[in-house]
Curated annotation (Swiss-Prot):
The family this protein is said to belong to: Belongs to the protein kinase superfamily. CMGC Ser/Thr protein kinase family. MAP kinase subfamily.
Enzyme class, first EC level, given as a word: transferase
Alphabetical keyword list: ATP-binding, Kinase, Nucleotide-binding, Phosphoprotein, Serine/threonine-protein kinase, Transferase
GO MF annotation list: ATP binding; MAP kinase activity; protein serine kinase activity; protein serine/threonine kinase activity
Domain notes: The TXY motif contains the threonine and tyrosine residues whose phosphorylation activates the MAP kinases.
Residues bearing the modification Phosphothreonine: 175
Keyword Cytoplasm among record annotations: no
Higher taxonomy: Eukaryota, Viridiplantae, Streptophyta, Embryophyta, Tracheophyta
Catalyzed chemical reaction(s): L-seryl-[protein] + ATP = O-phospho-L-seryl-[protein] + ADP + H(+); L-threonyl-[protein] + ATP = O-phospho-L-threonyl-[protein] + ADP + H(+)
Catalytic residue positions: 139 (proton acceptor)
Polar residues bias locations: 488-507
Cystine crosslinks: none
Gene that specifies this protein: MPK14
Name the record gives this protein: Mitogen-activated protein kinase 14
Length: 542
C-alpha cells in the first residue's frame, strides 16, 4: 500500500464479505477503521457503457449529496478513481442497513399500531424534505425503504427521481417513467392529468402503509387496465368532474364506460386499524391528486398528534437548476464522466479546492485506493457463489444498489428470513447526537406490559438507564421494544426477532414465494451475523 497518501482510503476500509451482487456490480460489507462504523461499499461496474445508466447514477449520487436528512439514506464517501478521464467503475460507501421494508412486511405479522404510526411518520417526514427540495421520488415501494433493528426507516433509490422546475415541459419530464405498477398513482396509468404533482409520491406512501396493515400489496395489478379496475373496486368510480380533466382520451372513454362502482368503506377493508389511520389513508389514496394531502399536511393529521414535532420535520432549500442542467441537454459519455468525477471530488475536499481554483495537477498527486479495492472485490466475487451468502434481492434497474445486508452463515438462507433476526424496535430520532452506541440502550428491561401470549412485541417503553438531556428526553418520548413471547413469571430472552408471515405471502411480482426446507437443512436458531444483538441484549446499529 505504498501508493497511499494522507487520504489513506485503502487502509480506512477493511473489506469483509460480499453481501449482494447484480447487474450493477458488487456490494461488500466493510468496517470503517476511522469511525468503527459498519458500512456497505458498492462497486458499480462499467457505468459509462450506456449513457442512460450513467445519467441515472449521476442523478442519484447528486441527489443523495443534496438531500441530507435522517430519513434518507446517506452516502458517506466515494473513493477517488485512479484516473480522471479513464475510470469505468466507482466505489460508493453507504451506511450499512439491515433490511428493507419489503422483507419486514413479508416476515412479520406482529407489528403493532405503534409500529404502523412511527413507520408512516418517518416516511412522510422524509418525503416532506424531498418535496420541499422540489424533488419527486417517483419509485417509492417497500423495497426502496430501508429498515434496521431499531425500526428506523430510510428512503433510498433515487435513480428515477426528478427535480421539478417551473419551466420543465411535462411531456419531457415524464417520458421515461417506469416505476413499479403496484405503487403507481392512477394519474400515471395512462398519462391521465396534464400536470403531475408530488401527490404521486403520497399515493405510493398510502399503498405502502396499506401493505403494512395487511401484509400484502393493496393494488397488485397485472397490467394498466387491471390496475385501474382494482383501484376503482376500492375507491369507486371517479366523479364526472375528475374524469373530464383526464387528458388521455382512451382513459376517459374507459372510465366513462365502466360500470358505476361504489367505494368500499376503509373500515370494512381494514377492520382492525386505527380509525384515525384510516381517515388519513383515505386522504392519501384519493383518486384525484388534488384531493391528496401534501406530506406536510399529512404530518399535521390528528393521527400523529402524540408523536409529531414540527421542530424535527425540517424543510429543504429548493435545488437550483444549475445542479441538474445536464438533464436539459444532450450529453455524451465524456460529459457524464466529468460530472461524476466532479461529484466524487465533493468527498475529497482538498482536491475539490484545487479543482475549483484551477491548480489541480494533470496527474494524480493523491493516488487512489481503487486499485487496492479491485483485488479484494475480485477475490470475494470469486468465492461469492460457493454458498457462503444468501442470494441478494434482484434489482429492477441499474441505479445505485440498496445498502441492504443479507444474512449469512454456513448455509444458504431464503430471502423470506432476511429480517427474521431484527432484534428490537426503538423509536428514536436519528438527528440526535446520542451517546456512544456501546452505552445507549444498555439496559432495555421491559418496564411496561409484557408481550401478549404468542406475540413478539411488547408495550411502548422508554430507555432504562440512559442519562439524557431534557431536550433528548422530549425527543425520546416513544419507544417500541420487540420482546419474545413469554410465559408468566419467565425471564425475557436477550434477543428476539420478527416472526415470519405466512410463507405463501405474495411477492411484489405477483408470484407465490415458498421456502424450500430441503435447501436449508435442519432448523436451527437464526443468527443475524452482520449486525447481531450483542450478548447483553443490545440490538445492532447502523
Amino acid at each position: 500500500m505504498d501508493f497511499f497518501t494522507e487520504y489513506g482510503e485503502g487502509n480506512r476500509y477493511k473489506i469483509e464479505e460480499v453481501i449482494g451482487k447484480g447487474s450493477y456490480g458488487v456490494v461488500c460489507s466493510a468496517l470503517d477503521t476511522h469511525t468503527g462504523d459498519k458500512v456497505a461499499i458498492k462497486k458499480i461496474n462499467d457505468i459509462f457503457e450506456h449513457v442512460s445508466d450513467a445519467t441515472r447514477i449521476l442523478r442519484e449520487i447528486k441527489l443523495l449529496r443534496l438531500l441530507r436528512h435522517p430519513d434518507i439514506v446517506e452516502i458517506k464517501h466515494i473513493l477517488l478513481p485512479p484516473s480522471r478521464r479513464e475510470f469505468k467503475d466507482i466505489y460508493v460507501v453507504f451506511e450499512l442497513m439491515e433490511s428493507d421494508l419489503h422483507q419486514v412486511i413479508k416476515a412479520n405479522d406482529d407489528l403493532t399500531p405503534e409500529h404502523y404510526q412511527f413507520f408512516l411518520y418517518q416516511l412522510l417526514r422524509g418525503l416532506k424534505y424531498i418535496h420541499t427540495a422540489n424533488v419527486f421520488h417517483r419509485d417509492l415501494k417497500p423495497k426502496n425503504i430501508l429498515a434496521n433493528a431499531d425500526c428506523k426507516l430510510k428512503i433510498c433509490d433515487f435513480g428515477l427521481a426528478r427535480v421539478a422546475f417551473s419551466d420543465t415541459p411535462t411531456a419531457i419530464f415524464w417520458t421515461d417513467y417506469i416505476a413499479t405498477r403496484w405503487y403507481r398513482a392512477p394519474e400515471l396509468c395512462g398519462s391521465f392529468f396534464s400536470k403531475y404533482t408530488p401527490a404521486i409520491d403520497i399515493w405510493s406512501i398510502g399503498c405502502i402503509f396499506a401493505e403494512l396493515l395487511t401484509g400484502k400489496p393493496l393494488f397488485p395489478g397485472k397490467n394498466v387496465v387491471h390496475q385501474l379496475d382494482i383501484i376503482t373496486d376500492l375507491l369507486g368510480t371517479p366523479s364526472p368532474e375528475t374524469i373530464s380533466r383526464i387528458r388521455n382520451e382512451k382513459a376517459r372513454r374507459y372510465l366513462n364506460s365502466m360500470r358505476r362502482k361504489k367505494p368500499i368503506p376503509f373500515t370494512q377493508k381494514f377492520p382492525n386499524a386505527d380509525p384515525l389511520a384510516m381517515r388519513l389513508l383515505e386522504r392519501m389514496l384519493a383518486f384525484d391528486p388534488k384531493d391528496r394531502p401534501s406530506a406536510e399536511e399529512a404530518l399535521a393529521d390528528p393521527y400523529f398528534k402524540n408523536i409529531a414535532n414540527v421542530d424535527r420535520e425540517p424543510s429543504a432549500q429548493p435545488i437550483t437548476k444549475l445542479e441538474f442542467e445536464f438533464e436539459r441537454r444532450r450529453i455524451t459519455k465524456e460529459d457524464i464522466r466529468e460530472l461524476i468525477y466532479r461529484e466524487i471530488l465533493e468527498y475529497h475536499p482538498k482536491m475539490l479546492r484545487e479543482f475549483l481554483e484551477g491548480t489541480e495537477s494533470t496527474g494524480f498527486m493523491y493516488p487512489s485506493a481503487v486499485d487496492h479495492f479491485k483485488k479484494q472485490f475480485a477475490y470475494l466475487e470469486e468465492h461469492y457463489a460457493k454458498g457462503s451468502t444468501a442470494a441478494p434481492p434482484e434489482r429492477q434497474h441499474n441505479s445505485l444498489p440498496r445498502p441492504c445486508v443479507v444474512y449469512s452463515d454456513n448455509r444458504p438462507q431464503s430471502t423470506a428470513s432476511v429480517t427474521e433476526d431484527l432484534s428490537r424496535c426503538l423509536i428514536r430520532d436519528n438527528n440526535l447526537k446520542s451517546q456512544d452506541s456501546a452505552s445507549v440502550g444498555a439496559s432495555r428491561i421491559p418496564q411496561g406490559a409484557a408481550a401478549r401470549p404468542g406475540k413478539a412485541v411488547g408495550s411502548v417503553l422508554r430507555y432504562g438507564n440512559c442519562s439524557t438531556s431534557a431536550a433528548e428526553q422530549q425527543y425520546e418520548q416513544r419507544r417500541v421494544v420487540r420482546n419474545p413471547a413469554i410465559a408468566p413469571n419467565s425471564s425475557v430472552p436477550l434477543g428476539s426477532s420478527y416472526p415470519r408471515r405466512n410463507q405463501t405471502c405474495k411477492s411484489e411480482t405477483g408470484d407465490v414465494e415458498r421456502i424450500d426446507s430441503s435447501q436449508t437443512g435442519p432448523p436451527k436458531p437464526y443468527v443475524a451475523n452482520k449486525l447481531p444483538a450483542t450478548v447483553d441484549g443490545r440490538s445492532g446499529h447502523w
